[in-house]
């Protein structure tokens, strides 16, 4: 009888964890008020939150603006919605991506996005959808990992989904250091390669 009770309890725990993973809770339901932050909204950028418009370039622009606005660091707030992506997004050092709303915002790598299929020397660990880097980002410039001198970079309260046709896609490269974190992020790898590569020093929920 005790064994049956134990097995029943374990099954209930497993089911509850599964339900929680499928329906992640948003930890920031209201729009935060921060005059120094940048908001990734249709009022500020040419974006739609329906998952049909590719917002890759707009998101990179928003991250670059955030890096340049307040002494090289800052927050980019992402409202609830679905955001289609098709290329690597570089997260500059000192920049935090924070989602908010009744549901977590979702970043979706589009089906068969260019470059996420083949394994090359540069993509041996996967082609990254999000890459935490050291310093800022500019097209054609040198790109390097976040390092021991990278502080405060983070991603919070968002979800990531990799669609089919991207077998070499890795959702996040998180080679970072002090006060950097990934928290309250659910990654649906699907048929992709990996969720997080070279994990940093703080991963939570």
Protein language model regions, located:
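Extracellular/periplasmic carbohydrate-active domains that bind, remodel
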Residues: 20-205
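Bacterial N-terminal signal peptides
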Residues: 8-18
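Bacterial N-terminal signal peptides that target proteins for export
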Residues: 1-8
């Amino acid at each position: 009888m005790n064994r049956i009770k134990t097995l029943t309890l374990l099954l209930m725990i497993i089911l509850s964890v599964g339900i929680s993973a499928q329906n992640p809770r948003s930890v920031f339901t209201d729009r935060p008020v921060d005059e120094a932050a940048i908001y990734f909204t249709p009022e500020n950028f040419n974006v739609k939150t329906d998952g049909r418009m590719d917002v890759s370039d707009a998101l990179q622009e928003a991250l670059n603006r955030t890096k340049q606005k307040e002494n090289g660091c800052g927050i980019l707030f992402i409202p609830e919605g679905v955001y289609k992506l098709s290329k690597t997004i570089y997260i500059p050092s000192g920049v935090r991506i924070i989602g908010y709303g009744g549901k977590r915002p979702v970043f979706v790598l589009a089906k068969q996005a260019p470059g996420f299929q083949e394994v090359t020397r540069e993509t041996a660990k996967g082609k990254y959808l999000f890459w935490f880097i050291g310093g800022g980002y500019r097209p054609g410039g040198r790109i390097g990992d976040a390092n021991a001198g990278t502080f405060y970079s983070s991603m919070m309260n968002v979800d990531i989904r990799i669609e089919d046709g991207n077998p070499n896609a890795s959702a996040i490269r998180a080679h970072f250091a002090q006060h950097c974190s990934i928290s309250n992020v659910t990654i649906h790898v699907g048929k992709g390669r990996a969720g997080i590569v070279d994990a940093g020093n703080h991963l939570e929920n």
